Amino acid sequence: MAVTFSRLFGFAMVVVATLALAGCGGIMPKSSSLRASQSLKSATLTKLKDMGSSPGQAMMIRLFKQTNEFEVWKRTTAGTYKLFKTYEICAYSGTLGPKIKEGDRQAPEGFYNITPGLMNPNSSYYLSFDTGFPNKFDRAYGRTGSDLMVHGDCSSRGCYSMTDEAIAEIYALVRESFAGGNPVVQMQIYPFRMTPQRLAAYSTNPNIGFWQNLKEGYDRFELAKMPPSWDVCEKKYVFDLKREDGSPLEAAAACPPRSNDSLWTALQAKQAADDAVYKTEVAAISSREAKNAAAVQAEAEAKAAAKARGDAMGNFVGGLFGGGQPAPAETPTEAPASGGGAPVPAPAPKGT
């Protein structure tokens, strides 16, 4: 009995020491089975308090591929969300654009809901949680893929990877948000910040229509600092749009009419202003590209003309010094036949 108590006491001391280490600034080793339950650092708790939030408050995540940014936003006592911290994404697979099919090594883009069932405390990449790909939108287009994660270990094959220290804190923040009674953490994944200037730079990209669809959700958050609700109808993302009875929308069916949208007027004004900037930027880019193409063409034509002049001068000079066209060869004259090869005698002089 004494031995058993001693072992239990020793185990408890290890747990306390490990949790204390995590709380003081370190993180548990990958070998620890308790790494998923490690406490938030004291500095993290202080920062949350100073911004008017707490671990149990709701949170939202935004990712930007182009700049490798992973943002965590927390709801404050005012009801709106504030940026808590921006982490650097170690790596993600593929290029800008959504994931289409299993094995394409693309990291997803779009709107995803992280739920407790997507958390993986036993990840071989320190800690991880699933993005929830494919979501309702992805399935409407027949997109395939599985186990698209946010994880540690700083390596990626279709996922978003973070440092172990970063994923330890992010995982704990998500866990505590669930513990506070919030059933979902919304994750918004973008190729870049959805400004009209950035969109204009990719106006010829085949994904431009998809990105412009995502922009409405981006704009709604920028205006209200509240995560928009999202759903899918007519095979596109829609935001803050519900049926009167609150039932889910059908992904390929017609969208219901919009009503009681408090952001609609402000959103329309923002979109109109952004659209004007977008068109101006696209026109400016097209003009620059046309000028560059004309300059390249002019340079190529100038080089060709210079070469032609050089060739002509070379031929002219060569002609002056016999280096032009060669004279036609003379036809050799054959000796007359000798009738067997003996010499023909000269005729005798007349009158002799």
Q: Which residues does each PLM region occupy?
A:
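Short Gly/aromatic-enriched secondary-structure transition segments
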Residues: 76-92
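Bacterial signal peptide processing site
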Residues: 25-28
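N-terminal post-signal-peptidase region of extra-cytosolic proteins
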Residues: 42-60, 72-74, 91-102, 109-115, ...
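Acidic helix-start/capping segments at beta-turn-to-alpha-helix junctions
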Residues: 65-67, 88-94, 187-195
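Exported/periplasmic cell-wall-interacting domains
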Residues: 103-261
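C-terminal motif of bacterial Sec signal peptides marking the signal peptidase cleavage site
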Residues: 20-23
